[in-house]
Amino acid sequence: GDHRDLHSCPTRRSSDLGRTVTALSLGCGTGAAEIRWAETGRFSRIDAYDLSAPRIARATQVAEQQGLDHILHYAVGDIDRLQIADNTYDVALVEQSLHHFSPLDRVLTAISRSLKPGGLFILHEFVGPSRFQWTDRQLAVVNSLLRILPEKFKTKWASAEIKKEVFRPSRWRMHYNDPSEAMESSHILSQLAIHFDIVELKEYGGTVLHLLLYEIAHHFLPGDPEAEKWLALFFEVEDILLQTGELPSDHIVAVCTTK
């Protein structure tokens, strides 16, 4: 399915419960996803948290403007310090934020305990190498494609610099740029299996495309036949490598239920 399916998953799955539901959302940012969920009429209450006060302020403002503040309740909160009541929510939602949380064991325990019996945990996540320590095979594939790509497609966004090679970042650099980035991402799937029953898992790649197109994706817009030809090649290469098991998927959508 396309990217819209990723966002419809929480609504589709919550509707399976046959009633309006209460939801917990962690790492909500400016609340764009939560707005979409609230608009469906499937949720009676969504409690959403993020570390950033400016983002929460923006999310709250938009909810009020859209007349959804009776459903959406935003607050600044750190997952390590949140006092989430047990057996409270029908659904827990995490979109591209779980890979910023650590220790995973404690976080997933808290999420599991917050759910009612039979509750759903729905996540859309990066599950690739922790601290972006890309594998040798992954880098070899990406850089092989980059080498054959014409230079006109390799100028970086808002820059004259040419993207020549993708490297594995140093752990020091990763910690310096963002101490929370991908701390335990490679352990997410194994930890999920410990704390939840995984009832649906969709892998959608990104193992090649994410690294390859980072900073140069603006060249590959609809309407340019040559760019579309290259993009089709990139998708084909990644799809084949995923299908054959040569590379794992770095991104997933999963629906889990409490054990």
Where are the regions that the model predicts?
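A short glycine-rich, Lys/Arg-flanked "PGG" loop and its adjoining helix->strand segment in the class I
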Residues: 105-120
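C-terminal lobe and adjacent flexible extensions of AdoMet/dcAdoMet transferase-like proteins
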Residues: 195, 199-259
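Substrate-binding/catalytic lobe of Class I Rossmann-like enzymes that use SAM or dcSAM, i.e.
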Residues: 154-219
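Class I SAM-dependent methyltransferase SAM/SAH-binding core
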Residues: 25-26, 30-81
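Conserved class I S-adenosyl-L-methionine
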Residues: 122-158
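Short, small-residue-biased leader/transition segments that mark boundaries at the very start
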Residues: 2-3, 7-14
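A short acidic, Gly/Pro-enriched loop at the edge of an enzyme's catalytic core
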Residues: 83-92
